[in-house]
């Protein structure tokens, strides 16, 4: 079974996916949204990769160096054993600055014996467009593509460079290194320098993980998902949905999208999760990104580029075969043109936490207040209109219940912020508007025929997003309507241990895969309505659906439990953390002994 058995490494500038046999099959340089250098993930023949060739007698196992994002792949045979430690340098270089170069180290550590290997270095820059040439110099191997001759990469190594290019077999007799850099290095690189980079990066990750709150159960699960979320954050505070593009929701279908952008919804949920377990710095950086990006215009979008870009035009790369033959391969995402009324609810919930717990300086508070007013003017003007919803349908807009609920959240949180700042007129106005939304949802969203809230005002379909009505405070768990909705959603959408997000037809047909995050939403919903044992059993089952490193993509196959969709996905990992916290915090409460 192909379970997306990749590890991820990165440094908040870019990231790489490395297979369970140590082959780099996805890497964009110099940034997350740059063209790929290796894209075998999307085309085995053309995409390019960077790996190690060993005989069939070698056993290979992979794990993370504990508490870090340094990936270890160990090759073992009778003749010898070696370990490849993959990482991207990431550490504080000055008092307030971090060193985040566009480069990747492969530290080859000799464990025992005299293992034999060959380096398979096959870059294919610019999404494998153009002819590739490798030029060997005394210092490095230079990669150049005919598609853009100014875009180059440099491979440094303690191994003979001609042996690398010619893929000759090498007998490992000591520790060696490979360094792939987007820039030509200004200082000489040797094994001692590499070890310094390794130690600095190791210390950085250990310190970062140490700031994550600790729990008596599921701590390892929480920690790994938090490390993934950190890798999905750009250094300016933007948060990516995933580091990949065009991994299909279902193999062979066309629901293939580029996720290397910052959605307000996804990012707000991710940052709130990071803040909840102790990472205040990530929240502050995101708030600065939001202020600088959204304050530039009142023409709000649901998503932006990682540097705040507004135009994210979608095109296809028709020369690539696609993951497992699933075409098209897309870059860019036309969803940026959509109206999704729910997005600002998630953002306003986070901004409310900002005001409560990390308000910053007076000028920052005032700048944020101006943004709050603009957002809520937008929400007030648009909540009555149809939209594309949380699932970004590409057909006609609808009056989605979850969108109305999140508009209520936006106005409710805005009213609370206004009350905190003693802006009583705004508080009263926004409370009244929020109450109007509540009445509207209760009148048009609840359907007696199905004894549940429905997906939209105009249908009787069920939708997993209805489960969010309780955690965002629209309706209490004790309300019979919420309990009935949870049970109705489970009956309609829970299938073979997993959840559909919805199962009515959309503009691409009927969804055929499970949405990973939605199963975690169901677990939480079952927990809050009192079905604790069922919730915990289902949670433990879901954890087994991760790959060999505990990483999750966006989707799962109902029958095989094979992962699909972009990977690793922020939605899935924030849901892992939030669900694990239900049980971890309960366990800690029960284990607390008063003196």
PLM feature segments, named:
Residues 1-595:
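Acidic, mature catalytic/reactive cores of soluble proteins
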């Amino acid at each position: 079974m192909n379970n997306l058995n990749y590890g991820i490494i990165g440094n908040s500038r870019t990231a790489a996916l490395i297979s369970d046999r140590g082959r780099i099959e996805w890497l964009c340089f110099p940034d997350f949204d740059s063209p790929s250098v290796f894209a075998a993930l999307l085309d085995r023949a053309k995409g390019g990769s960077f790996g190690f060739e060993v005989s069939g007698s070698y056993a290979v196992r992979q794990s993370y160096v504990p508490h870090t994002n340094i990936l270890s792949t160990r090759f073992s045979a009778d003749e010898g054993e070696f370990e490849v430690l993959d990482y991207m340098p990431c550490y504080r270089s000055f008092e307030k600055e971090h060193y985040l170069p566009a480069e990747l180290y492969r530290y080859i550590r000799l464990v025992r014996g005299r293992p034999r290997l060959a380096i398979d270095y096959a870059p294919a820059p610019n999404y494998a467009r153009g002819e590739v040439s490798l030029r060997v110099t005394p210092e490095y191997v230079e990669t150049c593509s005919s598609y853009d001759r100014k875009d180059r990469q440099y491979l440094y190594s303690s191994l003979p460079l001609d042996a690398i290019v010619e893929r000759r077999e090498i007998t490992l007799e000591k520790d060696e290194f490979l360094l792939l850099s987007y820039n030509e290095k200004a200082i000489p690189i040797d094994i001692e320098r590499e070890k310094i980079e390794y130690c600095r990066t190791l210390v950085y990750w250990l310190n970062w993980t140490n700031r994550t709150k600790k729990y008596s159960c599921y701590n390892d699960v929480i920690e790994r998902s938090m490390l993934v979320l950190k890798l999905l954050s750009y250094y300016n505070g933007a948060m990516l949905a995933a580091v990949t593009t065009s991994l299909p929701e279902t193999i062979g279908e066309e629901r293939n999208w580029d996720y290397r952008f910052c959605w307000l919804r996804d990012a707000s949920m991710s940052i709130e999760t990071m803040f909840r377990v102790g990472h205040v710095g990530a929240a502050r950086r995101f708030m600065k990104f939001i202020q600088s990006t959204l304050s530039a215009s009142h023409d709000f979008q649901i998503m932006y580029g990682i540097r705040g870009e507004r135009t994210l035009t979608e095109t296809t790369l028709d020369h690539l075969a696609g993951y497992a033959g699933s075409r098209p391969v897309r870059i860019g995402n036309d969803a940026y043109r959509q109206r999704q009324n729910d997005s600002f609810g998630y953002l306003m919930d986070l901004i409310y936490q900002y005001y409560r717990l990390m308000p910053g300086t007076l000028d920052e508070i005032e700048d944020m207040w101006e943004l709050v007013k603009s957002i809520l003017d937008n929400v007030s003007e648009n909540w009555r209109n149809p939209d594309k919803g949380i699932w970004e349908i590409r057909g006609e807009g609808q009056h989605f219940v979850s969108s109305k609920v999140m508009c209520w959240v936006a106005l409710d949180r805005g009213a609370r912020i206004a009350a905190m700042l003693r802006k009583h007129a705004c508080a009263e106005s926004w409370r009244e508007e929020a109450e109007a939304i509540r009445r509207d949802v209760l009148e048009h969203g609840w359907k007696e025929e199905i004894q549940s809230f429905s997906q939209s005002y105009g249908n009787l379909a069920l939708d997993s997003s209805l489960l969010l009505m309780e955690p965002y405070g629209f309706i209490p768990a004790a309300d019979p309507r919420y309990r009935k909705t949870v049970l109705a959603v489970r009956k309609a959408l829970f299938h073979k241990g997993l959840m559909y997000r919805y199962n009515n037809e959309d503009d691409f047909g009927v969804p055929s895969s499970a949405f990973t995050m939605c199963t975690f939403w169901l677990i939480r919903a079952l927990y809050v309505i009192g079905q604790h044992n069922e919730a915990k059993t289902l949670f433990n089952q879901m954890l087994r659906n991760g790959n060999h490193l505990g990483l999750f993509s966006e989707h799962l196959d109902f029958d095989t439990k094979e992962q699909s969709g972009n990977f690793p996905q922020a939605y899935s990992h924030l849901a892992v953390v939030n669900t694990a916290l239900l049980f971890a915090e309960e366990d800690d409460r029960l284990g607390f002994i008063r003196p």
